[in-house]
């Protein structure tokens, strides 16, 4: 997919990434997650569901990051500036 990599290709050990808008549309992608609209949709749904859970009594606190751990990799999603950045990395011994 053409466009900026948003610097995600510089993350150590990255196996793939997605940049998604809040509606789930893929804006940029690479590697194992190249054009993976299904994963994008699932992560957006998970973020929307998780954001409904109050984290504290202070309404200014909101969900900013979500990690989904699998056997040999982790998907990490960060929400910022109306974009969702999803990165796939291998798990390590400490995770």
From Swiss-Prot:
How the protein assembles, per its UniProt entry?
Part of the Ragulator complex.
What biological function has been recorded for the protein in this entry?
Regulator of the TOR pathway, a signaling cascade that promotes cell growth in response to growth factors, energy levels, and amino acids. As part of the Ragulator complex, may activate the TOR signaling cascade in response to amino acids.
Provenance organism: Nematostella vectensis (Starlet sea anemone)
Subcellular location(s) of the protein: Lysosome
Task: Specify whether Cell wall biogenesis/degradation is a keyword of the entry.
Answer: no
Official protein name in the record:
Ragulator complex protein LAMTOR4 homolog
PANTHER family of this UniProt entry? RAGULATOR COMPLEX PROTEIN LAMTOR4
Covalent S-S links between cysteines? none
**Which top-rank group of organisms is this from?**
Eukaryota
Q: What is its main location?
A: other
How is this protein annotated for GO cellular component? lysosome; Ragulator complex
Q: Which UniProt keywords apply?
A: Lysosome
Give the protein family.
Belongs to the LAMTOR4 family.
Q: Biological process GO terms, please?
A: cellular response to amino acid stimulus; positive regulation of TOR signaling; protein localization to lysosome; regulation of cell size
